[in-house]
Amino acid sequence: MRIAVIGAGKWGSALHLALKENHNCFISSLHQRDLEDFVSIKEALECEYLIFALSSQGMRVWLKENFINKGQKILIASKGIEDQSCQFLDEIFLDFVPKENFCVLSGPSFAAEVMQKLPTALMISGINQELCKKFASFFPDFIKTYIDNDVRGAEICGAYKNVLAIASGISDGLKLGNNARAALISRGLIEMHRFGKFFGTKEETFLGLSGAGDLFLTATSVLSRNYRVGLKLAQNQKLDSILAELNEVAEGVKTAYAIEKLAKMKGIYTPIVNEVVAIFKGKSVQEATQNLLKQND
């Protein structure tokens, strides 16, 4: 049995390091990397189990350019919504593999802490529960895995919390205090759940590891690149320069636009996301924050 992680960024590297403890695990990306166990894309695609840790915005292009055997088993470890199509990652993968052959990984997990082998709990969601259990068995003892079948709920939580982390970073960057941040995060959880209900998700998903757990982590720590984007926006830095300086993908930026578009199409009330997008488009962080503080729900 061989496993390949597709994507050699921080998260992909952390997953590879964890999985190689007990299994024959390789890592691959579009560009050659000087990494232990690095293999070409062609070699990676010969593995039975694939774990995708690519940018959500680049996922479709990668899948179109590289042939995946429909019998291969896939774990989607990326978190985001495609901006152009407003499609969730499972919808993108359905164009290439049957839904019984993939699962979604979610939950509170900073790559740096996984690489340090610190205790971590993750959720694996899929309609094929046996496949979920199989992927769960790959992880070492310091990573506790749970399984469920709410794929869409896990995806919405993983994507939405990145946008809320930007909002939280803005609040902290403006030095509005712990009370304001707590209010923002709790209202953000309600907003995220309201959005998810439209897609038939389970309420417990939003209260568990995938939702509240990942949100509380991502929206309160400088280890979160999305939170750091918010901090810098509060300092009146331009988004383009922030992203260039970050030199990493902050999934919450593109995801915010996708959620805003989806919410408008479906008639879902998403005030926090709307204000974050307005800031991206030039609205002052002070005005946007004041608007949020005045909201009644």
Curated annotation (Swiss-Prot):
Q: Which UniProt keywords apply?
A: Cytoplasm, Lipid biosynthesis, Lipid metabolism, NAD, NADP, Nucleotide-binding, Oxidoreductase, Phospholipid biosynthesis, Phospholipid metabolism
Catalytic residues in the record: 161 (proton acceptor)
What's a Pfam family this protein contains? NAD_Gly3P_dh_C
Pathway recorded for this protein = Membrane lipid metabolism; glycerophospholipid metabolism
Any one biological process term the GO annotation gives: glycerol-3-phosphate biosynthetic process
Is this entry keyworded Hydrolase? no
EC number, as in UniProt: 1.1.1.94
User: Which reaction(s) does the protein catalyse, per the Swiss-Prot or TrEMBL entry?
Assistant: sn-glycerol 3-phosphate + NAD(+) = dihydroxyacetone phosphate + NADH + H(+); sn-glycerol 3-phosphate + NADP(+) = dihydroxyacetone phosphate + NADPH + H(+)
Please state what the protein is called.
Answer: Glycerol-3-phosphate dehydrogenase [NAD(P)+]
Q: Which gene encodes it?
A: gpsA
